[in-house]
Design a protein with these regions (language model features):
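Non-catalytic cap/lid and distal C-terminal segments of serine-dependent acyl enzymes
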Residues: 1-268
Length: 268
């Protein structure tokens, strides 16, 4: 019997430092085996990469198998050194906007909130460092660039959509933490809505919101209410879709959300 570590030949990692704040990121990449389509590879960027990258990579591999598969895509996981599936302190900083502590509930573990409010620094990392690095290494389809996040990651997806909409073409928010800071994300949405109504978008945008049917009632309601409002703004450059995954709660919904996110990128 020979026992050895199990690795995938198309997986690789790199360490990149955000020059804005000197924080390190471990970046996970799943490279396609097939040649790109004529317009290049689509790319799905997955937040919480330590925990979610491999699920996204294998779902993408299955959905792009020939002869019936969709065009190949690259999966990029944004994670942290150290190997934890979810680095609580780092993600709490990266995926949140600034908030007053009195506007936040008590944490389930009773501990104080860690440092918060680094979302715009992470957006800068995407825009100025990570995405240019991927584009230098691969032939990329600029019209097939997706951002996926779950929970606080879903909040970050919405924040990026509303404040830096040209960065991606596809936005997938799974079980978004709309409750954050007394639903301050809705103020960003109102500003984005004004921009949208003025036809002041530089690129076509596609958004998918997902939530589990067995999640907390306010999580389902918040997502549905926001998605319904966004759907009323449908136009040539703005499309919004909704998926309620029945019988799934906040954790079990993740794999189904990733599957729908990948298919959403590859088919729209």
């Amino acid at each position: 019997m020979i026992i050895k570590p199990y690795t995938k030949p198309n997986y690789e990692t790199m360490l990149i430092t955000n020059t804005v704040n000197d924080l390190d990121y471990e970046i996970f990449i799943a490279k396609p085996f097939d040649e790109p389509a004529k317009d290049g590879y689509g790319v799905i960027y997955v937040l919480d990469g330590n925990g979610l990258f491999e699920t996204a990579a294998e779902i993408t591999r299955l959905l792009t198998r020939k002869p019936k598969g969709y065009h190949s895509a690259i999966v990029v996981g944004i994670g942290y050194p150290g190997g934890e599936a979810f680095d609580t302190e780092r993600r709490m900083y990266d995926l949140t906007m600034p908030a007053e502590l009195e506007n936040l509930p008590q944490r389930p573990n009773g501990e104080p909130w860690p440092n918060l409010g680094g979302a715009d620094e992470l957006i800068s990392f995407f825009e100025n460092e990570l995405m240019p690095t991927i584009e230098q290494q691969y032939v990329i389809d600029k019209h097939k660039q997706a951002l996926f996040g779950h929970s606080l990651g879903g909040l970050f997806v919405l924040h990026t959509l509303y404040t830096h909409s040209s960065l991606f073409s596809h936005y997938i928010a799974s079980s978004a933490s709309i409750w954050w800071n007394h639903q301050a994300i809705l103020n960003e949405y109102e500003a984005f809505k004004c921009q949208l109504l003025k036809n002041d978008l530089s690129n076509a945008l596609k958004t998918l919101m997902i939530v589990g049917g067995d999640e907390l009632e306010y999580m389902v309601k918040d997502s549905l209410d926001l998605c319904t409002s966004m759907m009323s703004l449908h136009g040539p450059n703005f499309e919004v879709s909704w998926a309620l995954l029945e019988h799934e709660e906040h954790v079990s919904v993740i794999s189904g959300s990733i599957s729908r996110a990948v298919k959403f990128l590859l088919t729209t």
